[in-house]
Amino acid sequence: MTHCCSPCCQPTCCRTTCWKPTTVTTCSSTPCCQPSCCVSSCCQPCCRPTCCQNTCCQPICVTSCCQPSCCSTPCCQPTCCGQTSCGSSCGQSSSCAPVYCRRTCYHPTTVCLPGCLNQSCGSNCCQPCCRPACCETTCCRTTCFQPTCVSSCCQPSCC
């Protein structure tokens, strides 16, 4: 508890595979940390060990907590991450395209959600550059389902 955060925080979130890789490794089966005391030094309550690992859809350690939708999808597992399509191995349809759901999406420190489907591009996937409000050079780098870079802002039609 002393290495986690304030006393109101339970240590179950404070894993090396959760949120920050430098967090303490001792854990228990108690409920997860509350955001009121753990948002800065512990894993956020949405983090789950099966999702918030350094292999979760990224080849490097995550710098932000996984969202519930990320933790609930099979594509968040290491068996799927990095593939151009998920298929049956991830329990997703062939339209799953984590090829553009990577750390380079919009902001380098953003944890992009895996298993992005065509219907969800620009909403809960990591493709905010497909929104007219995000017309910045650093934002528009990858078109939907294509690993090629673009130099101009993405249009809604790219999704």
From Swiss-Prot:
Keywords: Keratin, Repeat. Signal peptide: none annotated. Sequence repeats lie at residues 8-12, 13-17, 32-36, 37-41, 46-50, 51-55, 56-60, 65-69, 70-74, 75-79, 80-84, 129-133, 134-138, 139-142, 153-157. Pfam families: Keratin_B2_2. Residues 8-157 are annotated as: 15 X 5 AA repeats of C-C-[RQVSGE]-[SPSNQ]-[TASPI]. One of its GO terms (cellular component) is cytosol. The keyword Repeat applies. Belongs to the KRTAP type 9 family. Interacts with hair keratins. In the hair cortex, hair keratin intermediate filaments are embedded in an interfilamentous matrix, consisting of hair keratin-associated proteins (KRTAP), which are essential for the formation of a rigid and resistant hair shaft through their extensive disulfide bond cross-linking with abundant cysteine residues of hair keratins. The matrix proteins include the high-sulfur and high-glycine-tyrosine keratins. This is Keratin-associated protein 9-8. It comes from Homo sapiens.
